[in-house]
């Protein structure tokens, strides 16, 4: 049987989804926090777009919680497209409905039309400068069940109030507590986000991106005082092909 190029279908790159759950409440508008966060997100996208692998595509989605609720600010978008079109900066206003953001993130992860099971294990990043002011406990419990429970999780509390947040620490749990990157103030956001970007990039460059590289977060002080040391944690065999 002769080879027919028209019948040949190239394998599509496998996706590594990255979901950013970002605090867009009014408190983020003070002291340059939202501006610093916008720059950090844009830099993360630029760095992801530089990754050389052709058999993988990094998809970034943004969920913002602020105003009167939470909404999907940006559906999954390939980083190359984001670089070409430009990242639209976030604005800050309103309250801190983190529970609503968790619900949206779970819906996105559980929906196979949006997050296919063939994709690599998603990375979910939670950023906030305070405690949630909605009913977050049930959405948090729901997030820790099903497909969403298998995600790699990071958190970046900004300031003392967020660093004491029960919700942020519950989001990480014991499994990912070392993925807490504390930003004392706006100027520390870029450094914290850079460390998270580096951790995800390590997965991209690894032989098996479903092997999660854990990193030791900096202590709740100036982030630059401590450099994280990598620690490797293997996924269970039954999760190796799909998350």
Name each model-derived stretch:
Residues 11-74, 81-121, 123-127, 154-169, 187-192:
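Von Willebrand factor
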Residues 18-25, 82-89, 175-176:
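A short small-residue
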Residues 159, 208-243:
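Extended acidic, low-complexity intrinsically disordered regions
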Residues 160-213, 217:
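Von Willebrand factor A/integrin I-like adhesion domains
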């Amino acid at each position: 049987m002769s080879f027919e190029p028209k019948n040949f279908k190239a394998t599509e790159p496998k996706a590594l989804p990255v979901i950013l759950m970002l605090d867009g409440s009014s408190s983020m508008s003070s002291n340059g926090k939202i501006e610093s966060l916008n720059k950090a997100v844009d830099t993360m996208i630029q760095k992801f777009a530089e990754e050389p692998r052709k058999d993988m595509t990094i998809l970034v989605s943004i969920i913002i919680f602020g105003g009167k609720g939470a909404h999907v600010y940006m559906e999954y978008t390939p980083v190359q497209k984001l670089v070409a079109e430009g990242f639209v900066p976030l604005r800050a206003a309103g309250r801190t409905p983190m529970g609503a953001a968790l619900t949206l993130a779970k819906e996105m992860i559980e929906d196979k039309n949006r997050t296919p099971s063939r994709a690599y294990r998603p990375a979910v990043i939670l950023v906030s400068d305070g405690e949630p002011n909605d009913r977050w406990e049930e959405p948090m419990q729901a997030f820790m069940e099903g497909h969403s429970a298998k995600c790699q999780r990071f958190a970046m509390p900004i300031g003392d109030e967020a660093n004491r947040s029960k919700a942020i620490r519950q989001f990480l749990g014991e499994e990912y507590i070392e993925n807490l990157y504390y930003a004392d103030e706006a100027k520390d956001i870029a450094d914290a986000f850079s460390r998270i970007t580096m951790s995800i990039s390590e997965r991209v460059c690894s032989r098996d991106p479903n092997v999660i590289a854990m990193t030791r977060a900096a202590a709740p002080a100036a982030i630059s005082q401590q450099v994280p040391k990598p620690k490797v944690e293997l996924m269970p065999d039954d999760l190796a092909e799909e998350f």
